[in-house]
UniProtKB/Swiss-Prot annotation:
GO BP terms, alphabetized: isopentenyl diphosphate biosynthetic process, methylerythritol 4-phosphate pathway involved in terpenoid biosynthetic process
Organism: Xanthomonas euvesicatoria pv. vesicatoria (strain 85-10) (Xanthomonas campestris pv. vesicatoria)
NCBIfam families attached to this UniProt entry: Dxr (TIGR00243), PRK12464.1 (NF009114)
PANTHER family, per database record: 1-DEOXY-D-XYLULOSE 5-PHOSPHATE REDUCTOISOMERASE, 1-DEOXY-D-XYLULOSE 5-PHOSPHATE REDUCTOISOMERASE, CHLOROPLASTIC
EC code(s) of this entry: 1.1.1.267
GN (gene name): dxr
Job of this protein: Catalyzes the NADPH-dependent rearrangement and reduction of 1-deoxy-D-xylulose-5-phosphate (DXP) to 2-C-methyl-D-erythritol 4-phosphate (MEP).
Name the record gives this protein: 1-deoxy-D-xylulose 5-phosphate reductoisomerase
UniProt key word Manganese: yes
Alphabetized UniProt keyword annotations: Isoprene biosynthesis, Manganese, Metal-binding, NADP, Oxidoreductase
Length: 396
């Protein structure tokens, strides 16, 4: 990016933790970055507060019933920001000239349409919505390639691989990539101990500040399983070339092993502002507000194999990747329903992988030849998981 050009950034999911980190980086560089569009799901008061601070040209609330509150709130603040509501408005703005860069941070499958719209329009896509890749990875990467869109991953692990691969012409020289995992807050516990885990315990991640759904995914290691599927789509690698290592310090974010015996790794403090700064300024580097890594102070780096017996979600994700077609979409949808039920206290922690496995084995796999096919598989998986939940409630 030329130093004199102003990058117009849309932040989808602005009221979440990734949105907050993105806006922090943007605010540090007013001479080169501007938040031109902010969106939120239903947190209209938080969205208004962000608009007052960042003064975007446009603000979108997904819940159309909250449009009057957004419109009137912007007027009361004396802002020229235009109010919009609904998914169609967001998709249209993502496709238009309001932005050249999109931070896709809407949680869950709800983020897919706007992510696809941005890709279709050839935008730089800072992808934090992992469900877009898991649900429709082939479609998204194909769409981006056809439109000349640039996908830069924001997950720390995929950003690390992106940075390592961009350091050389490595298109044919990769032996494998190794995703690191913190192990979550319950690393080392057996299934008997995991049965007693509460939602409050599961959302308290020891290293990263994240929303509740992603925190639970980290606790079950489904987060890492989804990242394996993402890495397959982002970097064109089969599952056999994607490994996972538990690294509790969360300082080595991922590694790339090359055929010549070299291994490159990217290290840094666990802070999403680093990867967002990479995506916003690439190929340049800008201050993210994150300090440097003091290895002497850290003292040690530990690595261990993941325990897939205690945390079967990682195994289920590999199973879905090997099955291909609609299987990853089924995995993702079942997990969203199961995690939501756990957070609401309807089921225990160990019910999450059990429900996901039930749905994966119940639904037949089909070729993922269109978005409609994928969305139908998503809807079917949700119905089957909800039915299994109702059965669980009756027999609890």
């Amino acid at each position: 990016m030329a130093g004199s050009s102003l990058r117009q950034v849309a932040v989808f999911g602005a009221t979440g933790s990734i949105g907050a980190s993105a806006l922090d980086v943007i605010a540090r560089h007013p001479e080169r970055l501007r938040a031109s569009l902010l969106s939120a799901g239903s947190k209209v008061d938080e969205l208004l507060a962000l608009c007052a601070t960042h003064r975007p040209a446009h603000a979108v609330i997904a819940d159309a019933a909250l449009y009057p509150a957004l419109r009137d709130g912007l007027r009361a603040l004396g802002l020229a920001t235009q109010a919009h509501a609904g998914a169609e408005a967001l998709d249209a703005l993502a496709s238009g000239d309001v932005c050249d860069t999109v931070v896709a941070a809407i949680v869950g499958a709800a983020g897919l349409p706007s992510t696809l719209a941005a890709a279709r329009a050839g935008k730089r896509l800072l992808l934090a919505n992992k469900e877009s890749l898991v649900l429709a990875g082939e479609l998204l990467t194909r769409t981006a390639a056809a439109a000349g869109a640039e996908i830069i991953p924001i997950d720390s692990e995929h950003s690390a691989i992106f940075q390592c691969l961009r350091s050389c012409d490595a298109s044919r020289g990769v032996r494998r990539v190794i995703l690191t995992a913190s192990g979550g807050p319950f690393r080392g516990r057996d299934r008997a101990a995991l049965a007693a885990v509460t939602p409050a315990q599961a959302v308290a991640h020891p290293k990263w500040s994240m929303g509740p759904k992603i925190s639970v995914d980290s606790a079950t290691m489904m987060n890492k399983g989804l990242e394996v599927i993402e890495a397959h789509h982002l970097f064109g690698l089969p599952g056999e070339q994607i490994d996972v290592l538990v690294h509790p310090q969360s300082l080595v974010h991922s590694l790339v092993e090359f055929v010549d015996g070299s291994t490159l790794a990217q290290l840094g403090l666990p802070d999403m502002r680093t990867t967002l700064a990479v995506g916003l300024a690439w190929p340049e580097r800008v201050d993210s507000g994150v300090g440097g890594l003091d290895l002497l102070r850290q003292g040690r780096l530990d690595f261990e194999a993941p325990d897939t017996a205690a945390f079967p979600c990682l195994r289920l994700a590999w199973d879905a990747l090997r099955a291909g077609g609609t299987a990853p979409a089924i995995l993702n949808a079942a997990n969203e329903v199961a995690v939501s039920a756990f957070l609401q206290g309807q089921v225990g922690f160990l019910a999450i992988p059990a429900l996901v496995e039930h749905t994966l084995t119940t639904l037949p796999r089909h070729n993922a030849d269109s978005l409609d096919t994928l969305l139908f598989a998503d809807a079917q998986a949700r119905q089957i998981t909800e039915r299994a939940l109702a059965h669980h409630a009756l027999h609890a």
